[in-house]
Amino acid sequence: MNDFISSLNNWQALYALSNTMLSLANSGQWDELIEQEVKYVTLVEAIARNPIEPDNSVFQEKARELLTKVLANEAALKIKLQARMEELRVLIEQNGNQKSLVSAYGKLSGNVLMPNDFNQ
């Protein structure tokens, strides 16, 4: 019975942590979110090591409900992470463009160009 309770406690902790992670993503706290990922994986591993036995239908149903909620949070989190990855991709692209401009026009810095310089 204690193993069942321990396993169900892990499921509840996983759901609570998934709520926390989604909240962190919603508020843009990406570093904190990454820190929570390690705890999340550890809980998933603990659940895998200590599954709820098939003959305990009450605990299995509770775990199933929690799993459904966790999966919904994961789906929402995935959408947030994809949006963040797109933001970072745009920033990296802009940085690359800026470096190209600096490289191209930096060679001309310190030079005064006169209109007739372009005709030669």
Curated annotation (Swiss-Prot):
GO cellular component: cytosol
Region annotation FliD binding: where it falls in the sequence: 59-97
Predominant place of localization: cytoplasm
Cellular localization per UniProt: Cytoplasm, Cytosol
InterPro entries: FliT
Family listed: Belongs to the FliT family.
Self-association and partners: Homodimer. Interacts with FliD and FlhC.
Protein name: Flagellar protein FliT
Native species: Cronobacter sakazakii (strain ATCC BAA-894)
